[in-house]
Amino acid sequence: MASSIDPLTRLHGILSSYLSEVLGVDRSVVERLLAPPPRKEYGDLGFPLMRFARSSNASADSIVESLRGKLWERGITWASPTLEAGYLNIVFDVEKLGDEVFRLLASGWRPSTARTSRPETIVVEHTSANPIHPLHLGHARNSSLGDALARLLEARGHRVNRRFYVDDVGRQAVVASLGFKLSGVTPRELASRMGVKVDHAVGWVYAVTHNALETVTARKRGDTSKVDEALSTLARLKERGDREVFDRILEAVGSLDDPEGLVSEMMRKYERGEEPEKSLIRGVVSAVLEGFRETLGRFGVDFDDWDWESDLLWSGLVNKIIEEARRSPFLTTHKDAIALDIPRIVREVLARDPEAASTIKLPRSLEIPPLILVRSDGTTLYTTRDLAYSVYKFRVTGADRVINVIGADQRLPQLQIRLALLGLGYRREALNMMHYDYEIVSLPGRRMSSRRGEYVTLDELLEMAKARSVREVESRNPGADRDWIESTAEKIAVGAVRFALVRPGRLKPITLDVERILDLKENTAPYLQYTYARASSILEKHGEIDYLKAHPASLEEGSRRELFVEALRFPLVSAKAADDLAPEDLASYLLRLADMFNSWYQKDSVIHEEWEGARHAKAALVLLVKSVIGEGLRLLGVEPLEKM
């Protein structure tokens, strides 16, 4: 009876185990080097055997011969090992392999990510947007990457904990809350008056209040250009929002004796958990989180835990870190504030710890300054609170690893935090947390500034994409049910945005072209959804597959063979994408597979195939490809569509 593990994963496991043992090489090295050869004529799988055989007691020929016997013992009669030019090449007998795959498909098996033999508990913290305005394009990329990572790691067999860090402490949350205090309205009341989501209303109040404060302080400094800039922004904000609330905020800020002093005092009181600041700021931030949850729900993203920054302060965790720093030999003063001497930690701790040095890689030319912990006014910095949060994530979950999805602009602070943890004795945490950074994303001709209230919200982007999708679905399905059109267009829009923000790789800046990411002829999610729908249509027209009649030898034909083997690689491809934290590799694989499928079925009809054995075999191939594309899309947060 065929194993429930897919054939290629089973083969890969046997090869990795045997070669690792006989060559005395770490299994992970073998697994990484086992790959399709550069040229098809070499075979279906290859390994640089001579590179390692020279230092082993066995000859390369004897290793290959012994391997052949091992494979037969394990029932793998469809894989033939050969030795050519120092390489172990494996050639698949597609007739025998097809027979095994057909039996699996008949039993209900579908390809899925190969499970790890070493499952871990992994925290993925992502999105964690500042709760003072709606989610924007940058957050969309963060969410798309973070959720794809979580899905991949979970599919790989890891225990994944998704966390959102609520950044409610600091100046920005106070400024937004001050605006509501001065205006006399609540976030929900204002949202109702403006006819917008509550997070959009808070974003508007934050921008108005920030620029009102900026006008006052710039006038005191005599900075006329800043005054003019703030007034220009305020004029535009007035046109976009509630004029009565706008006038109240402006008048109230103008009448304050010391507006900046008031902001600082509110910050200090909130850090201490004093009323009425505690209820005011918590109320405003909670309202924004309502808007976040609505948007993220639409985007297909959810979280296991929402961690409030203020809770870390009020629980004493932040003070514990500060006290540990005060007792540390690395305590110093920097810019009249207490700090940790990061350069000294690098010299005296990192440089003497080879494992830490190889894990926490420092850019050669980067000068890393001390990490300030507490300002001269007694308030903490966000990096201090991040230190406490880093420890908290490990302790509360028992995590083996923590992955923080945070923008590339935070590389220096994130590096400082890891080094500070190392210096304070939190070595395990420092070595097992990762800054998963990503570059910016923009729309052509649109600039972003939350302080000016200028940003492309994720809500707006999804509406733009959906409107275009509705028109496309309507044109392809005249007279279709309206609810189905709306539902399908929504899935296309969400999938298009998510896929476009993952596919290029995290370190490539993106300029998002909404028309292009929806194009069925481009490397897009809609193209993959269309391919999936096309496969569904073929299978519907074909009817039930009779696997007893399906003739696996018919898959030996060139393009069929290539497509068959490529589809069977999915469990290993997605496993490697999970291990490498590279969802873009899975995206590239799916596009390549879809290209192969679309090229094949247009030239080699399934429905009109005259020979019954080949027709059922080709239908089974369509089902295999459809299953792979569907599972791959789901791992990237894109919903497959039976019809478009």
Swiss-Prot record:
Gene3D superfamilies per record: Arginyl tRNA synthetase N-terminal domain, HUPs, Isoleucyl-tRNA Synthetase, Domain 1
EC class of the enzyme, as a word: ligase
Subcellular location, principal: cytoplasm
GO biological process: arginyl-tRNA aminoacylation
SUPFAM superfamilies: Anticodon-binding domain of a subclass of class I aminoacyl-tRNA synthetases (SSF47323), Arginyl-tRNA synthetase (ArgRS), N-terminal 'additional' domain (SSF55190), Nucleotidylyl transferase (SSF52374)
Cysteines joined through disulfide linkages: none
Keywords carried by this UniProt record: Aminoacyl-tRNA synthetase, ATP-binding, Cytoplasm, Ligase, Nucleotide-binding, Protein biosynthesis
Motif mapping: 'HIGH' region: 129-139
Keyword Cytoplasm carried by entry: yes
SMART domains per the UniProt record, alphabetical: Arg_tRNA_synt_N, DALR_1
Example GO molecular function: ATP binding
InterPro entries the UniProt entry points to: Arg-tRNA-ligase, Arg-tRNA-synth_N, Arg-tRNA-synth_N_sf, ArgRS_core, DALR_anticod-bd, Rossmann-like_a/b/a_fold, tRNAsynth_Ia_anticodon-bd
Catalytic activity: tRNA(Arg) + L-arginine + ATP = L-arginyl-tRNA(Arg) + AMP + diphosphate
GO cellular component terms given for this protein: cytoplasm
Presence of keyword Protein transport: no
Enzyme Commission number(s) from the entry: 6.1.1.19
Subcellular location field: Cytoplasm
PANTHER family linked to this entry: ARGININE--TRNA LIGASE, CYTOPLASMIC, ARGINYL-TRNA SYNTHETASE
HAMAP family to which the protein is assigned, alphabetical: Arg_tRNA_synth
Family recorded in the similarity comment: Belongs to the class-I aminoacyl-tRNA synthetase family.
Protein name in UniProt: Arginine--tRNA ligase
